[in-house]
Amino acid sequence: MNSTNMSLKFRSRSAISVALVDQLMFATTIAIARGIRLCAGRSQYLAATCTPSRFVNKFQVRSSSNSKNIDDKLQTIIDSSNLGAVKKQNEANNKSRNASDTVNDTNTAIPSSSETFHQANADEHTISESTKRAILAENPTLPSQRERLRTETSKRIETYLESLQKTIFRATRTLNDATGYSSIEGLKNEVEKLEIELRRAKTTVKECKKAYTDAISVRSQSQQEVNELLTRKHNWSPSDLERFTELYRNDHTNEQLEAEAARKLTDAESKVDSIQLKLTQSILTRYHEEQIWSDKIRSASTWGTWVIMGINVLLFFVATLIVEPWKRKRLVASFEDKVKVAISEVNLSNTDSVVEKNTIPAPEASALNETSFSSQISLEPSLLSLSWSQWTWTKFSNYVKSTTSRVLYGNGEIQAIDARLLLVISTFLGCILGNILSGR
């Protein structure tokens, strides 16, 4: 501990001594600079008073240069000391403060300009809005005006229709994915692409054929000209010799061009053949897949038809055996209740003598109603009451009409045999209809 305290004290004393030495050096440098300046001023004064005028300018220039050099040396000494560093730091702080003040001034000046700009934009916007309103008022049939005059109900209906269209599209796509028609659509698109590619390949073949024909014609013309020159070989001129040499030299080039054109033509034709084969195979595949899909849909529609027919038959049985008897019983019960109420009211309102003379007793009235109802039922036609000789198409159609009206509207009572007969007829007609639909 004592050693550390001693070291700290020594360090602090050394730092204090260094600071004092720096201050003394700075003070001495200042004193030296002042003395040098004073001597320079005195020398200038003596030179100005004692020397001639022609030597004054030279001496002033020399003295000014010497003073500048002295000032520079003094400035370097001051800058190298601690006080010079503190002075530099203070100057840097002052510069940063001045820069921040200028930035703040510019920032305060900018909002005013931005405010004027926004105000000008607002004025221009109001002018444009007023002009736009005037134009819209002059032309009320514009689409924007019609859109503005539309009610919320029409907008909701339009939105609902758009959502319904999207829903139908999604449902259709889902149904196609479920039934496998999406893959058939992919085959259809592939066939269309192959057709376009086949057209392009055929165009390329035509171009290659034209190039091959041109190459053959050029070579044949050169060979014909060579043959003509060879026929008059003994009468060649220097130009004929040069022409023969040129033709003989170009013959090899023409042969290469012809071979290249033939190769390109062969490649183009082979490409057309491959595309044609691929297109034919894609068309056959698409046709086969469409046949399978149509068979699947046809079988599904047949089963759906049979299911619908079964539901109709079930509803017919339910309506005939359950609903109609229940309705009939309820109607009869309500009718009997109304008759009883009416008879009781008549019995209470009239006296015994008036009832005996002018009214019919309740049992007789009910018996009369039952007999009239049974007579109406007995008047209904029935096929069992007819013999084979009495069967005609008119009687059969009348029977069907009356039975159908009784089934649909509840006009009278339907017998069990009539229900069975109608069931057999409807089943027979349903089987015929199902066979016709499935045969398609």
Swiss-Prot record:
Residues 180-215, 259-283 form a coiled coil. Its main location: mitochondrion. GO terms for cellular component: mitochondrial inner membrane. It is a multi-pass membrane protein. This is Sensitive to high expression protein 9 homolog, mitochondrial. It comes from Meyerozyma guilliermondii (strain ATCC 6260 / CBS 566 / DSM 6381 / JCM 1539 / NBRC 10279 / NRRL Y-324) (Yeast). It comes from the Eukaryota. The gene is SHE9. The chain crosses the membrane at residues 303-323, 417-437.
